[in-house]
């Protein structure tokens, strides 16, 4: 039984109550009694609204299911379908043109285009690494990944390989020629760097040149009479620091003495309480809240053991430079932090209230996330003995990403929640900013209205292909069998969805005011492919896009030097490339022309992916990790990838493409493979051969067989219940 404390009509888990009173409230000038009474009133007032919104989701889905079932043998009529969605209030009138009015937003959001990390907040080491990923070594990122091929003697090996190192240096020089070109010649031929009369001078043998754009030299860092120094350059609002040390092992091999090129990388980072974490009870939630508090105070630390050495990882300090005219320049040493709360669906046992029937019920998790992440973030707005040495926002804002909202009424509810939380926390109205995840179909179709509902709070919109595809499948579950998962990326609605997000954001005045983001690169080991392909996102007008690691952030940062996103947005402003009918194009299989082996391949791929993710989620509480696919390619998996895989199989099951026996047989084939892929993990519990004794195996099976009945196809209800079951059995 969870130990609880009564706070008014709230029954608060002791672990949460003590954390709030002893750790989070000190330094905020908020009276504990006033705080808890305020929380109780917010919960009491907003719970009915939250439930009403969920009821609306279910009612709309039931009407859509019925419409499709009555027309399953008829050709799809987009005109009739569009009118039906209008009639039931799913597709709403588009509001008149407007411009967002959000104020007090940091430059990282309004002015700087660059990568965005997403990291599970429950893992302190990951969180620290991500916060510190504002700056990253290009040399390390190139040397340690497949961006540099292991051919022509350039293998990584266990010792430093000079052949590979030379290729890294050559690659970096070519990049510098693109981002900060010289007035004449190339960085490749440079033999020295110096500063003369406030200008950067680059020696090319006996000759000398400067930068093609001298204003890109913005600073340097040099100790008196030291050969170890650095040059700070800027391009498209991003910084490049060239480290020079002729005595270093790498610098000795370089004609200029350059030992590394440091790129400003993860400009912003989302600390995630949602899809990448397993927070199923009060203990889990408090672990996340405590890490978030430590990030805002600047005192989060973690003991790390690397190469047999133990050290304490801390948050990086800001970086100081001398400007060309002798002034001082300070740049942030850390990524600007967002926090992603959960959506409107889930509840948490961290706080219980009277359900009205004599039974206690859990409160909506999204409500308490707003309260407690907002409370912790107050410490990131100021420094002091009780607030820590570092700040997050320099403009007094707290940035909260709100996922899985369906339509403008749900966005408006989030804004009302934030306003009420500001009152409880004694914050000025508008302090809590919102990032809108455009990852549900009803939000996509009504995006302009969604943005208008948060016009004075919104700081980003972001597309999320995987969750959005999961909702696409579930919304039209009764329409017929869907195309295969791999074909979804080429479907009509996807391109319309990506284009519409950018165009509507720009029309609402996002340029220079808010982020327009795009989705995650999931193939964590395939960085060469990422470098080749992910440049398409800034080319599409996105000011940020998600990356899975600090290394990926550094490599993706190159794209924002190669593409002037502001210029792209200027060109796109005023366009409306997608139509509603394109967005309404359901990705149905035209005919069931798949061979039996193709069906089996899809089912096996999806079952393996589901098992590989769910077994770590349920058994070990790992919500985001590199999961090998059926071909042993490491993919970054979270609940969004699980949603699409489980929903596709549920759809095929619903329409007779496969049977429940096919699902079970595939799961039993794939479980031994997943067991083998995890054989090196001492904490891993095999699922085979006693499948029905494995809670994780049963969870994976349930996600597929019951997928059509899950609210909007979400995986949280089953995952949370199964994880709690596992924890109860293994206390």
From Swiss-Prot:
Residues noted as binding Mg(2+) in the record, renumbered to the chain: 439, 467
CDD domains found in the cross-reference section: malate_synt_G
Cross-referenced InterPro entries: Malate_synth_C_sf, Malate_synth_sf, Malate_synthase_TIM, Malate_synthG, MS_C, MS_N, MS_N_TIM-barrel_dom, MSG_insertion
Top-level EC class: transferase
EC number: 2.3.3.9
One annotated GO biological process: glyoxylate catabolic process
Active site per the UniProt annotation: 340 (proton acceptor), 638 (proton donor)
GO MF annotation terms: magnesium ion binding; malate synthase activity
Binding-site list for glyoxylate: 340, 439, 464-467
Catalytic activity: glyoxylate + acetyl-CoA + H2O = (S)-malate + CoA + H(+)
UniProt subcellular location: Cytoplasm
Purpose of the protein: Involved in the glycolate utilization. Catalyzes the condensation and subsequent hydrolysis of acetyl-coenzyme A (acetyl-CoA) and glyoxylate to form malate and CoA.
Family: Belongs to the malate synthase family. GlcB subfamily.
Name by which UniProt lists this protein: Malate synthase G
Organism: Mycobacterium leprae (strain Br4923)
